[in-house]
Every structure is written in C-alpha cells, then in structure tokens.
C-alpha cells in the first residue's frame, strides 16, 4: 500500500510542477520533497498505528495472565471449550488444554483465545521502516520517469504510462 501512495502522490506532484515549469532540477526538488515528506508521514502513521496495536495486545496479555493466576480452573475450562469449537472431541480437548496449560499457559491461551503470541508482538519500528521504504520505492518511479526519457516525452505520456504500469 505504501508503494502505491508513493507512486500516486509523487506522480501528481511532479506532473503539477512540470506543468508549470520544464526545469528538471525544480521538478526533482519538488519530487524529492514530496518523497521525503511522504515517507516520513507514512512511517510516523504506521508507527503510531502499530504501537497502539501492540499496547492493546499487551493489555490483553496482562488480563489473560491475571485470569490465569486468579482462576486457573475456569481458564482451563475456557481453553477446553475453545479447542472443542475448533473440532476436538471433549476428552481430547481437555487433555490438549491441560498439556498446553502445563507447558505455557499464557502462550496457549493467548494463541487460541486471542490469536496472538506473547513473544511475537507487533514491532512499530519495523512497521515504520517498512512503510517508509515502500513509499520511497513507489515514489522513485515517477521521479525516474521525469529524468530518464527525452524532454518532450516526460510529461504526460511517459509519466502516466509508468504510473499505470506501476499500479497494475
């Protein structure tokens, strides 16, 4: 998704500047400014989003940990029921729930009940970097199209074709 944002926003920016001026350095300056702003914006947005997700997951794990400490038998019954809903026979579900709880109760409940793994929570820094890199790669396509073809083909034919191909 970040790559598409980079393609579309940067293409719009360079086409707009190119419509006002054929000065390649001015077009590139505007394009790189848009690329930089867009990459930072995408990274910050992704960081905030994934941080909120991780905070929610941590809160859910704290609740689950507390429930396991305060009412272990009820939690074992809950896990048994969840495993039965996944298709296990009652005796098999009870045995599996008991074994999973003995190995790592929090991990078992988190995975089956919450769909998360306590040791594999979302990483906001990795998500931010990935988003910034995606946007940058997408934004480079229209920038290269401004520089590489002969001047009379830059805007609009080659730019629009390149954007359409990149989005396809």
Q: What are these language model-derived features?
A:
Residues 1-14, 118-144:
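Transmembrane alpha-helical segments and their cytosolic interface motifs
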Residues 4, 50-132:
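Cytosol/matrix-facing amphipathic helices and coiled-coil assembly/linker segments
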Residues 8, 12-13, 41-53, 107-111, ...:
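Alpha-helical transmembrane segments and their lipid-water interface positions
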Residues 15-30, 144-155:
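Helix-coil boundary and interhelical linker segments in multi-pass alpha-helical membrane proteins
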Residues 24, 30-55, 99:
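Selected alpha-helical membrane-embedding segments in polytopic membrane proteins
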Residues 27-32, 128-132, 156-161:
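Hydrophobic alpha-helical transmembrane segments
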Residues 34, 135, 163-167:
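Residue-level recognition of pore/gate-forming positions within transmembrane alpha-helices
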Residues 141-142, 157-168:
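Transmembrane alpha-helical segments of integral membrane proteins
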């Amino acid at each position: 998704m970040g790559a598409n944002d980079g393609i579309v926003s940067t293409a719009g920016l360079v086409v707009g500047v190119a419509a006002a001026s054929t000065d390649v350095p001015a077009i590139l300056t505007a394009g790189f400014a848009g690329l930089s702003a867009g990459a930072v914006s995408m990274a910050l947005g992704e960081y905030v989003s994934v941080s909120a997700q991780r905070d929610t997951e941590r809160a859910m794990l704290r609740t689950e940990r507390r429930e396991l400490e305060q009412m272990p038998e009820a939690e074992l019954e809950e896990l048994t029921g969840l495993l039965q809903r996944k298709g296990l026979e009652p005796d098999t579900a009870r045995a599996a729930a008991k074994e999973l709880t003995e190995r790592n109760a929090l991990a078992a409940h988190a995975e089956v009940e919450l769909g998360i793994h306590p040791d594999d929570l979302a990483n906001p820094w990795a998500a931010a970097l990935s988003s910034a890199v995606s946007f940058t790669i997408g934004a480079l396509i229209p920038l290269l199209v401004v520089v590489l073809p002969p001047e009379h083909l830059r805007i609009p034919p080659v730019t629009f074709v390149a954007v359409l191909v990149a989005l396809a």
